[in-house]
Every structure is written in structure tokens, then in C-alpha cells.
């Protein structure tokens, strides 16, 4: 399977907007509402979800993860020179990006659903300890823009867009986070090197204009190799698909936010 790191890095630059907290001078400041899914901007998280903290005074520097930060296939818990760490339920969250107003991290995959405490520490100065409830899944599609889901044509990985729409009967790749447990399980800190399908695949659905696509149209749903927290769905567009349908993902009782469309030209 082709590496998806360049695409995932592009996904990571698609930033959600969150409520601005009221901050005290100097200390890291954020709120429960400003800890959100990095894909959708919704305050819904699950284990193995790519997440963002928005606030003030989160870091003195701006840094994104680089290959040199990854040692022996393990993600960093702090980016060199930043002095920033995030703890989630007593474990360090692995970092992808830090800046004064935003920090991107991975919710540890070994956590269980339920309430956890999230706290950001900047060079020994701690921000508030915020209580957040983790769901078993918090589906969220990465976005090309505020109303368009991010998708790639198969097999060349070019972007699906209004200028290059998907077609019925053709395969596309969708990119998401928060889809829940996989088999074999995601391991704490380790970058996945092989495919790992959703554990509850029978409870996973892709909805186009509210209608579940046939099971045989989902060729794969699970981790995207080479990038922790990123999920890949291989979807064959149904022959009946209309133009630019709304697309949502459902994992168990949890659905991705409404309002995103997938560019399709019947």
C-alpha cells in the first residue's frame, strides 16, 4: 500500500476553528470547548483521534513534526525546542504541531472511553486540567474546505474536487480520524506500518445523502499505514449516486458532522 504521509501532512494543515477562551497572562490557556477534533473542529474525541487544542500562550515557538523527530518508528511526546507536552488520561499525547495558539496531538489509542483529564504543559508551566469525555468513536472527515470532504482518486491519489469530481463506479479514498478500535490494535506511540481494519466494521457505514452505501462498496476501512490517528476508507461510488451528495461516516452510534459534500458527477 502506498505511503500516505505527504497527503496526511496536507490534511494536518486543514485547521478547524474553535471558541476562544478567556486567558490569564503568561500561562497556557484553553478551555474544554477549545479541545476539538483536528478534522471537524467538533469537541468530540475518542482514543486514537487526531486532536487540536486552541488557546493562548500554548508554546513560545512554532514547530511541526519532521522525520528527525521520529525515532525507531515512535512518535515524539515533545517537539525539539518547544518544551510543550500534552497529557491525556495520565499518558503523554504524541505531538504533530505546536504554536502559540494551536497544538495538534494524538489522543493515545490505549485509553478507554470515559472521562479523562487533558492538560498542556509549556516548559514546566501547566495550563488548566480539563475534563473531557472520550467516546468509543468520534468520526470526522478531513475537509478540503468548509463544505467539502477531502478525498483522493484511486490509484493516483489526486484530489477529488469540483474540477476533478468522483464518478459513479469509480473508487475514491476518504481520510478521517476518530473511527475507533482496529484489528490488530493501534499501539501507544507506534506509527502503523500495515493495514489494520476497524474492529467493529459491521457497525461502520458511509452515508451518501443519508443512504448507506452497499457493504461491497467499502473495500477497506481502517488505519492508513505510516500515519498514526489517520483512517482511510476505500469507497466505490455507487451507480445511483447523485451530484455532490452529502457524505457522513457512522461508527456505531456516532456520526460525523453533517454538511459536508463529496464532489460527484453522475
Say what each PLM segment does.
Residues 9-18:
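Hydrophobic h-region of N-terminal signal peptides that target proteins for export
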Residues 1, 18-19:
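Initiator methionine at the very start of the polypeptide chain
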Residues 2-7:
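Sec-dependent signal peptide recognition
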Residues 19-266:
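A sequence-level detector for low-complexity, Ser/Thr- and acidic-rich stretches
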Amino acid at each position: 500500500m502506498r505511503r500516505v504521509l505527504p497527503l496526511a501532512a496536507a490534511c494536518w494543515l486543514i485547521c478547524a476553528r474553535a471558541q476562544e477562551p478567556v486567558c490569564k497572562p503568561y500561562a497556557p490557556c484553553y478551555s474544554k470547548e477549545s479541545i476539538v477534533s483536528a478534522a471537524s473542529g467538533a469537541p468530540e474525541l475518542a482514543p486514537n483521534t487526531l486532536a487540536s487544542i486552541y488557546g493562548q500562550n500554548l508554546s513560545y515557538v512554532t514547530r511541526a513534526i519532521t522525520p528527525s523527530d521520529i525515532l525507531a518508528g515512535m512518535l515524539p511526546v515533545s517537539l525539539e525546542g518547544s518544551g510543550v507536552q500534552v497529557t491525556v488520561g495520565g499518558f503523554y499525547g504524541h505531538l504533530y504541531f505546536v504554536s502559540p495558539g494551536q497544538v495538534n496531538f494524538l489522543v493515545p489509542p490505549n485509553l478507554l472511553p470515559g472521562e479523562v483529564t487533558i492538560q498542556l504543559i509549556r516548559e514546566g508551566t501547566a495550563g488548566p486540567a480539563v475534563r473531557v469525555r472520550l467516546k468509543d468513536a468520534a468520526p470526522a472527515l478531513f475537509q478540503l474546505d468548509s463544505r467539502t470532504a477531502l478525498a483522493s482518486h484511486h490509484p493516483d491519489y489526486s484530489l477529488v474536487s469540483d474540477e476533478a469530481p468522483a464518478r459513479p463506479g469509480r473508487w475514491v479514498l476518504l481520510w478521517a480520524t476518530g473511527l475507533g478500535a482496529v484489528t490488530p490494535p493501534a499501539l501507544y506511540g507506534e506509527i502503523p506500518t500495515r493495514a489494520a481494519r476497524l474492529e467493529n466494521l459491521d457497525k461502520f457505514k458511509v452515508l451518501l445523502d443519508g443512504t448507506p452505501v452497499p457493504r461491497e462498496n467499502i473495500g477497506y476501512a481502517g488505519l492508513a499505514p505510516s500515519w498514526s490517528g489517520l483512517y482511510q476508507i476505500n469507497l466505490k461510488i455507487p451507480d445511483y449516486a447523485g451530484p455532490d451528495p452529502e457524505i457522513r461516516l457512522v461508527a456505531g452510534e456516532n456520526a460525523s458532522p453533517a454538511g459536508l459534500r463529496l464532489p460527484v458527477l453522475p
